[in-house]
């Protein structure tokens, strides 16, 4: 096993299986590999020095692009629905309608605010968003070896792209699928494009992107990164999986959810704000 796996944040149910998968990934090398990853709290940090970091949605919620009244409503929605999202006693099916409701209500509020497209870069710059330690190495190495990276996010695509653009890691090998804003000719938000992506319907989104995955039919080796049990379905659109390594970041309710995560993810990283483990695996493969 690798020294990075000795960290106390790392939890592995079946070390032999993990070793087997990693050997398969190493054997396939760069030409067979693709990355499928969530964004909020997976590539970005959950907290810095105990202070929560914003998601793509939170960046807008906390910015001066929305009125205080709107902010209060958005915070109220978060206080109502976030506990449902992470409730260990509810199934994904039970959570599903609540997530749709949350997104629909918050997106409606954002449209009412008539957000302006050209103000987004400033909102990102002024926010406390922070990518996980080791992000440059992660993105740059994948770019260097032309490994496709599919970022699949239930967040706000325009904000997400701006974050990775400002971080200097929006390389040509990166494709973002997310909730993209629809602006009118004056650059004012009028709605959202396409089907809603929320935490628990990524399976449907994955199937809508089969064209992308078909083009990568030789890339049967996958590293999947997520932070929610809903993220496990992100590779459902991949036609021919040979080896898949599922790495899960567990950020909240660690004690209650650890067993569940260990049943589903090959490697669980509890309260880990770094990309150390994925980077060490990529170093072996590439």
Swiss-Prot record:
EC number per UniProt: 3.1.3.5
InterPro entries: HAD-like_sf, HAD_sf, Pyrimidine_nucleotidase_eu
Keywords: Cytoplasm, Hydrolase, Magnesium, Metal-binding, Nucleotide metabolism, Nucleotide-binding, Transferase
Binding site for substrate: 85, 106, 153-154, 202
Enzyme class, broadest EC rank: hydrolase
Reaction catalysed by this enzyme: a ribonucleoside 5'-phosphate + H2O = a ribonucleoside + phosphate
Domain of life the protein comes from: Eukaryota
Subcellular location: Cytoplasm
Purpose of the protein: Can act both as nucleotidase and as phosphotransferase.
Protein name (database record): Cytosolic 5'-nucleotidase 3
Naturally occurring in which organism (per UniProt): Danio rerio (Zebrafish)
The gene coding this protein: nt5c3
